[in-house]
Amino acid sequence: MRARLPLNALRAFEASARYLNFTKAGLELHVSQAAVSQQVRTLEQMLGVALFTRVPRGLQLTDEGMHLLPSITEALQMMSSAMDKFHEGKIKEVLTIAVVGTFAIGWLLPRITAFLNENPWIDIRILTHNNVVNLAAEGIDASIRFGTGGWINTENILLFQAPHTVLCSPETSKKLYIPSDLKKVCLLRSYRKEEWNNWFKAAGIDPWTITGPIFDSTRLMIDAVKLGDYAALVPYHMFQKELNERSVAKPFEIYATLGGYWLTLQKSRVNHNSEALNVFKEWIIEHSREFVLKS
């Protein structure tokens, strides 16, 4: 029969080894210094070795103590992790969501705390991407992407359209009276080549060759426009905070709908989703509808 493990003594040893001080270990464990010392002494007697030597300013691990410590630390961490998997009688589920960065900061993160408060049993992991993601290969439960929804082997659910317009710094906006004034500034580009031409068409003006730098991050483009005579074509709803703070400006009420934000799921899992994924799916669809109504 396996000997009964002296868990209190092992916890006392591990805390004492971290602090090299019985008093500090006792404060962490909410017991007295004498109680910690006694627990360590009990463990030493069971093992037949000394785990610490007493030095003027505290404790020092013996060779035997240093040999024992990593195994005890790992075991206690594993027990703690096992307990963390439960919340109020329910096993916690890990949910991994890959989110395009613009949506993550502009929409999801301001709302995710409310979702977690409603569903504390869900342990959510948020990964950001630049619209390229492989759900199956990367072990991702769901993704939020920008585009027109034509991705293969996925179920694609439109959350909302994302009309694009020009944003720039407040100073730059002072020189932009009509759309053709954009020739005076450097236009920043994304990897989607036709975006500016689509906006020029919506503005009723002829396109011109754009040579501004190409960015793989819309967020980075907005950081750039704050620095000089730049303009970026972006989904302005995702930058409402910056517009409200007047760190960026919207010189024209001209919009081009270039795509939307989509929730994408593996087709092979559509009918076999975890409870956590189903709850998240219902939540984000509901809140997206509310967002559209308010917009």
Curated annotation (Swiss-Prot):
PANTHER family membership: HTH-TYPE TRANSCRIPTIONAL ACTIVATOR AMPR, HTH-TYPE TRANSCRIPTIONAL REGULATOR
Cited InterPro entries: LysR_subst-bd, Tscrpt_reg_HTH_LysR, WH-like_DNA-bd_sf, WH_DNA-bd_sf
Function: This protein is a positive regulator of gene expression of carbapenem-hydrolyzing beta-lactamase (NmcA).
Family statement drawn from the similarity comment of this UniProt entry: Belongs to the LysR transcriptional regulatory family.
Top-rank lineage group of the source organism: Bacteria
Keyword match Transcription: yes
Secretion signal span: none
Keyword Transcription carried by entry: yes
Name of one Pfam family that matches: HTH_1
DNA-binding region: 22-41
Residue span, HTH lysR-type domain: 5-62
Protein's name in the database: Carbapenem-hydrolyzing beta-lactamase transcriptional activator
Organism: Enterobacter cloacae
